[in-house]
Amino acid sequence: IRKEFKESKASLANSAGIFLNKKYHFDLVRPGIALYGGNPFINKKIDLKNVINLKAKVIQIRQIQKNDTVGYGATFKAKKDMLVGTIAIGYADGINRKFSSNMCVFLDGKQLKVLGRISMDLITIDMTSLPKLKKSKKIIYVDVINKYNDINSLSKNIDTISYEVLTSLGNRYKRQYI
């Protein structure tokens, strides 16, 4: 192609190619998933900064009793009295159902476990460690994706790739680009 189009720039390296070797770079590179902090390799550690922060609003906080169940199919049964929060996000927003009981969200750096099955629009979380929030009148948001819970660690939790976690996020989010 370069013989016919002498002024054309050559490109071979996508995100993975960028980290292989400069001989793959040619005239320019095409970073994709790496722009978002996604590791293009499955078995190779690359130190990338997470640039995605996904927040979800806590729409309900309630007390449940020992042996109460949470979620469709009653997939979570409380082993003790607990404070449970419901957040306004679910699989319709691209949060894979495989994250059911297999994920945490964060509030002020504190890890809160997902309880039970992720539903279409809602996820329940364990807020027992934050009892003062039960009576709070403040609007509360939790971090679903952040520096502790980036697309690379989330993808490992459900045996997929960071591309899938990122591209599954739907169009129901208010996006803010900084």
For the regions a language model picked out, list residue spans one by one:
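Active-site anion/phosphate-binding pocket segments in diverse small-molecule metabolic enzymes
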Residues: 1-178
